[in-house]
Amino acid sequence: MQFEIITTTAQLHDFIATLDGSPISLDTEFVRTRTYAANLGLLQISQNTQITLIDPIAVGDLSSFWQAIDNKNIILHASSEDLEIIRDHKGDLNFTLFDTQIACSFLNMGASLGYAKMVETLEAVIVDKGESRTDWCARPLSEKQINYAGVDVLYLQPCLEKLQQQLENKKMFPFFEQECQSVLAQKMVKQDPDKAYKLLNNLFKLDRQGLAIIKALAKWRLLTAQERNLALNFVVKADHLWLLAYYQPTSLDDLRRLNLLPNEIRIHGQQILTIMTQVISQDESTYPPLVNRLVDFPAYKSTVKSMRDKIQLCAEKYDLPLELLASKRVINEYLSWLWKLTNLQRQTANKPKLLTGWRFELIGHQFEH
């Protein structure tokens, strides 16, 4: 396998000059253990069978490359984390995405088919995944690591060409394109710190004051994590936020009794208590409403069963995996929109995934909208 390794800005500019309008296969290798943002360790690109590895640690500023892929066709596999890295470095996702994992899903090859399995199925090649857990920010990289990284983009374009033909035969290619663009759009939605608490568990067990506390603490935790580039749980563990909101301690000794980690108390203990005191002093009218679980709605089980029966028939009709067509999360998003919002609120709220695009065309139109 022949490839070029780029370690200087001059080499990068020379490489960018060779890029044409052909699809660009792309992959990233990164490390994210204690940090909020992933640390990019290697960038792999393949275009027209030419494989190039960019060393971001050696090169430094990659802005010219990110600008060069504007409006290009980009091939990725299982793109979620790659897109986050590209977004954080590039500032946007202004390109057309072709995610081969999504393509495999539309062909019912598996809802989350791995790269190695896809290559084995489509190219009859066994890919060694032995270096997947390596430290990609350590230098120097071994020959084995470099070869592994190159293979990760080597087969993307040949696989996509076969997948595209099968998708067109199945009349699913436009739906695949829609889904890929939807993934891009979702990745560009900025996380609202005021809504960070909604991603936490067991909110239904909290009263309104507890919800106000966990809302404020979750916002503070997110902003602190972003500012200090720390993984969220290295600021304060999610479970500990809930304990704070439920028991509402008033002293550092109380925090110790709740079994918060020593570092959490030493670094953030006083700040946590200050935030809680501020929330408790606020007018109750500012507190969030109680959280109603979907499973507690009387009609939930019967409605989900009825929906799943229809979705199953549709999945069989179009030979699609159930999880792609309408996963549990997609169903719950729809029911939350239907049951938790008023008619007026539904008119202005974003429509659930089930009622948009190709899902609405295939199945969503059968449900109340």
Curated annotation (Swiss-Prot):
Enzyme class: hydrolase
MF terms (GO), sorted A to Z: 3'-5' exonuclease activity; nucleic acid binding; nucleotide binding; ribonuclease D activity
Pfam family, one: RNAseD_HRDC_C
Superkingdom classification of source: Bacteria
Keyword terms, alphabetized: Cytoplasm, Exonuclease, Hydrolase, Nuclease, tRNA processing
Key word Hydrolase present: yes
Domain 3'-5' exonuclease: 4-168
Name by which UniProt lists this protein: Ribonuclease D
Name of the gene encoding the protein in the UniProt record: rnd
